[in-house]
Amino acid sequence: MKHLGRHVLAEICGCDFDILNDIEKVEEIMVNAALEAGAEVRECVFHKFSPQGVSGVVVISESHLAIHTWPELGYAAVDVFTCGDKVNPWDACNYLSERFSAKHMTAREMKRGIIPETYLKEVANL
């Protein structure tokens, strides 16, 4: 069955505290991860928490990359959602794991936009 996109959810552990707590560094790494995967970056929004932690989103033409960091735990929760077949979300996740100096990453991929054929036929008739 066809799908519209791929959504990888990654648990990245054993990361460098200073990197995960640096908003500029996290944004730079996230943008470069999108580019590494072959995506076209549109916009970025990042926020620094007190006393530590960063959350952010990189909006790409093909969907998005999102991150929430817990530097005190060396942990980052990452989503990479891509539409089409030109961008590989796994390339972005592997890049992030490497650049965060992670000791471990687990990830799962979910196909998104699996629309039943009967519904597509209904929509086509509107």
Swiss-Prot record:
Pathway: Amine and polyamine biosynthesis; S-adenosylmethioninamine biosynthesis; S-adenosylmethioninamine from S-adenosyl-L-methionine: step 1/1. GO terms for molecular function: adenosylmethionine decarboxylase activity. The modification Pyruvic acid (Ser) is found at residue 63. SUPFAM superfamilies: S-adenosylmethionine decarboxylase (SSF56276). Is synthesized initially as an inactive proenzyme. Formation of the active enzyme involves a self-maturation process in which the active site pyruvoyl group is generated from an internal serine residue via an autocatalytic post-translational modification. Two non-identical subunits are generated from the proenzyme in this reaction, and the pyruvate is formed at the N-terminus of the alpha chain, which is derived from the carboxyl end of the proenzyme. GO terms for biological process: spermidine biosynthetic process. Transmembrane segments: none annotated. It is an enzyme of class 4 (lyase). GO terms for cellular component: cytosol. Binds 1 pyruvoyl group covalently per subunit. The keyword Lyase applies. The record marks 62-63 as: Cleavage (non-hydrolytic). Catalyzes the decarboxylation of S-adenosylmethionine to S-adenosylmethioninamine (dcAdoMet), the propylamine donor required for the synthesis of the polyamines spermine and spermidine from the diamine putrescine. Belongs to the prokaryotic AdoMetDC family. Type 1 subfamily. This is S-adenosylmethionine decarboxylase proenzyme. It comes from Pelotomaculum thermopropionicum (strain DSM 13744 / JCM 10971 / SI). The gene is speH.
